Protein backbone atom coordinates (compact mmCIF):
# COMPACT_ATOMS: atom_id res chain seq x y z
CA UNK A 1 0.00 0.00 0.00
CA UNK A 2 1.52 3.31 -1.08
CA UNK A 3 0.59 6.31 1.06
CA UNK A 4 1.31 9.85 -0.15
CA UNK A 5 1.12 13.21 1.62
CA UNK A 6 0.07 16.38 -0.17
CA UNK A 7 1.11 19.19 2.20
CA UNK A 8 0.21 22.86 2.01
CA UNK A 9 -1.39 25.76 3.80
CA UNK A 10 -4.48 25.60 1.56
CA UNK A 11 -5.50 29.15 2.47
CA UNK A 12 -8.06 28.81 0.93
CA UNK A 13 -8.52 25.43 -0.72
CA UNK A 14 -8.86 26.09 -4.47
CA UNK A 15 -10.03 24.20 -7.53
CA UNK A 16 -6.34 23.82 -8.40
CA UNK A 17 -5.71 22.01 -5.12
CA UNK A 18 -8.68 19.73 -5.75
CA UNK A 19 -7.40 19.01 -9.26
CA UNK A 20 -4.11 17.74 -7.82
CA UNK A 21 -5.91 15.73 -5.13
CA UNK A 22 -8.19 14.11 -7.72
CA UNK A 23 -5.25 13.09 -9.87
CA UNK A 24 -2.99 11.98 -7.01
CA UNK A 25 -5.81 9.95 -5.45
CA UNK A 26 -5.92 7.92 -8.66
CA UNK A 27 -2.20 7.13 -8.35
CA UNK A 28 -1.85 6.27 -4.65
CA UNK A 29 -3.70 3.87 -2.38
CA UNK A 30 -4.14 6.59 0.22
CA UNK A 31 -3.59 10.34 -0.03
CA UNK A 32 -3.29 12.44 3.09
CA UNK A 33 -3.86 16.15 2.59
CA UNK A 34 -1.67 17.72 5.28
CA UNK A 35 -2.89 21.18 6.20
CA UNK A 36 0.12 22.98 7.65
CA UNK A 37 0.03 25.34 10.61
CA UNK A 38 2.75 27.47 8.91
CA UNK A 39 3.81 29.76 11.77
CA UNK A 40 5.89 31.91 9.38
CA UNK A 41 2.79 32.85 7.41
CA UNK A 42 -0.19 34.83 8.60
CA UNK A 43 -3.06 32.69 7.35
CA UNK A 44 -6.40 34.20 6.39
CA UNK A 45 -8.21 31.20 7.86
CA UNK A 46 -7.27 29.49 11.13
CA UNK A 47 -5.84 25.98 10.90
CA UNK A 48 -9.10 24.41 12.10
CA UNK A 49 -11.07 26.34 9.47
CA UNK A 50 -8.70 25.30 6.68
CA UNK A 51 -9.02 21.66 7.74
CA UNK A 52 -12.82 21.90 7.77
CA UNK A 53 -12.89 23.63 4.37
CA UNK A 54 -10.65 20.96 2.80
CA UNK A 55 -12.79 18.19 4.32
CA UNK A 56 -15.94 19.77 2.86
CA UNK A 57 -14.41 19.84 -0.62
CA UNK A 58 -12.75 16.41 -0.48
CA UNK A 59 -15.25 14.40 1.55
CA UNK A 60 -16.36 12.33 -1.44
CA UNK A 61 -12.90 10.84 -2.09
CA UNK A 62 -12.80 7.44 -0.35
CA UNK A 63 -9.00 7.19 -0.21
CA UNK A 64 -8.30 10.80 0.83
CA UNK A 65 -8.15 12.11 4.37
CA UNK A 66 -7.40 15.59 5.63
CA UNK A 67 -5.27 16.23 8.71
CA UNK A 68 -3.70 19.31 10.19
CA UNK A 69 -0.11 19.40 11.34
CA UNK A 70 2.46 21.69 12.87
CA UNK A 71 6.17 21.22 12.98
CA UNK A 72 8.31 19.57 10.36
CA UNK A 73 6.80 17.90 7.33
CA UNK A 74 9.24 15.00 7.79
CA UNK A 75 7.65 14.18 11.15
CA UNK A 76 4.13 14.25 9.66
CA UNK A 77 5.24 12.03 6.76
CA UNK A 78 6.90 9.53 9.13
CA UNK A 79 3.92 9.49 11.51
CA UNK A 80 1.60 8.57 8.63
CA UNK A 81 3.90 6.00 7.02
CA UNK A 82 3.95 7.87 3.70
CA UNK A 83 6.45 7.02 0.98
CA UNK A 84 5.72 9.96 -1.33
CA UNK A 85 5.31 13.72 -0.95
CA UNK A 86 3.11 15.26 -3.64
CA UNK A 87 3.76 18.86 -4.67
CA UNK A 88 2.16 21.04 -7.29
CA UNK A 89 4.08 23.14 -9.81
CA UNK A 90 1.98 25.89 -11.39
CA UNK A 91 4.73 27.71 -13.23
CA UNK A 92 8.47 27.83 -13.74
CA UNK A 93 8.60 30.35 -10.88
CA UNK A 94 7.49 27.59 -8.46
CA UNK A 95 10.22 25.21 -9.61
CA UNK A 96 13.28 26.67 -7.89
CA UNK A 97 11.68 26.75 -4.43
CA UNK A 98 10.06 23.33 -4.85
CA UNK A 99 13.31 21.81 -6.18
CA UNK A 100 15.21 23.08 -3.12
CA UNK A 101 12.46 21.82 -0.82
CA UNK A 102 12.53 18.39 -2.49
CA UNK A 103 16.30 18.25 -2.00
CA UNK A 104 15.97 19.09 1.69
CA UNK A 105 13.20 16.52 2.10
CA UNK A 106 15.37 13.89 0.39
CA UNK A 107 18.15 14.69 2.85
CA UNK A 108 15.79 14.43 5.84
CA UNK A 109 13.78 11.49 4.44
CA UNK A 110 16.06 9.51 2.11
CA UNK A 111 13.48 6.76 1.58
CA UNK A 112 10.64 9.16 0.65
CA UNK A 113 10.22 10.46 -2.89
CA UNK A 114 8.81 13.83 -3.95
CA UNK A 115 6.47 13.75 -6.92
CA UNK A 116 5.61 16.93 -8.80
CA UNK A 117 2.27 17.33 -10.54
CA UNK A 118 1.39 20.22 -12.79
CA UNK A 119 -2.19 21.48 -12.69
CA UNK A 120 -4.66 21.09 -15.49
CA UNK A 121 -4.48 24.03 -17.91
CA UNK A 122 -7.49 25.87 -16.49
CA UNK A 123 -5.93 25.94 -13.00
CA UNK A 124 -2.33 26.92 -13.77
CA UNK A 125 -2.78 30.55 -12.73
CA UNK A 126 -4.81 30.03 -9.55
CA UNK A 127 -3.13 30.79 -6.24
CA UNK A 128 -4.57 31.16 -2.77
CA UNK A 129 -3.02 34.63 -2.56
CA UNK A 130 -4.85 35.82 -5.68
CA UNK A 131 -8.12 34.26 -4.52
CA UNK A 132 -7.87 35.98 -1.12
CA UNK A 133 -7.10 39.35 -2.71
CA UNK A 134 -10.05 39.08 -5.10
CA UNK A 135 -12.37 37.99 -2.27
CA UNK A 136 -11.28 40.81 0.04
CA UNK A 137 -12.04 43.31 -2.73
CA UNK A 138 -15.49 41.78 -3.26
CA UNK A 139 -14.69 40.11 -6.59
CA UNK A 140 -16.11 36.91 -8.02
CA UNK A 141 -14.02 33.90 -7.01
CA UNK A 142 -16.52 31.23 -8.09
CA UNK A 143 -14.34 30.01 -10.97
CA UNK A 144 -11.40 29.46 -8.61
CA UNK A 145 -13.02 27.81 -5.57
CA UNK A 146 -15.93 25.52 -4.80
CA UNK A 147 -19.25 27.01 -3.59
CA UNK A 148 -18.60 25.96 0.02
CA UNK A 149 -15.22 27.74 -0.04
CA UNK A 150 -16.78 30.83 -1.62
CA UNK A 151 -19.27 30.88 1.26
CA UNK A 152 -16.44 30.72 3.80
CA UNK A 153 -14.67 33.59 2.01
CA UNK A 154 -17.78 35.76 1.94
CA UNK A 155 -18.40 35.14 5.64
CA UNK A 156 -14.79 35.96 6.49
CA UNK A 157 -14.58 39.12 4.37
CA UNK A 158 -18.14 40.36 4.80
CA UNK A 159 -18.08 41.24 1.09
CA UNK A 160 -20.74 40.64 -1.49
CA UNK A 161 -19.72 39.59 -4.97
CA UNK A 162 -18.64 42.44 -7.21
CA UNK A 163 -19.52 45.24 -4.82
CA UNK A 164 -16.26 45.84 -3.02
CA UNK A 165 -18.51 46.86 -0.12
CA UNK A 166 -19.38 45.19 3.12
CA UNK A 167 -22.77 43.59 3.47
Curated annotation (Swiss-Prot):
GO terms for molecular function: ATP binding; pantetheine-phosphate adenylyltransferase activity. One of its GO terms (biological process) is coenzyme A biosynthetic process. Gene3D superfamilies: HUPs (3.40.50.620). The record marks 17 as: Transition state stabilizer. Pathway: Cofactor biosynthesis; coenzyme A biosynthesis; CoA from (R)-pantothenate: step 4/5. Pfam families: CTP_transf_like. Homohexamer. Substrate binds at residues 9, 41, 73, 87. InterPro entries: Cyt_trans-like, PPAT, Rossmann-like_a/b/a_fold. Keywords: ATP-binding, Coenzyme A biosynthesis, Cytoplasm, Magnesium, Nucleotide-binding, Nucleotidyltransferase, Transferase. ATP binds at residues 9-10, 17, 88-90, 98, 123-129. It comes from the Bacteria. It catalyses: (R)-4'-phosphopantetheine + ATP + H(+) = 3'-dephospho-CoA + diphosphate. Reversibly transfers an adenylyl group from ATP to 4'-phosphopantetheine, yielding dephospho-CoA (dPCoA) and pyrophosphate. Its cofactor is Mg(2+). Its EC number is 2.7.7.3. Its main location: cytoplasm. Belongs to the bacterial CoaD family. This is Phosphopantetheine adenylyltransferase. One of its GO terms (cellular component) is cytoplasm. It is found in: Cytoplasm.
Amino acid sequence: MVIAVYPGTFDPFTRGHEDLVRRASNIFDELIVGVAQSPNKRPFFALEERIEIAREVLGHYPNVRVEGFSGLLKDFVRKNGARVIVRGLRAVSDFEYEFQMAGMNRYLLPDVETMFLTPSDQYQFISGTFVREIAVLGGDVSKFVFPSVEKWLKEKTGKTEGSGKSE
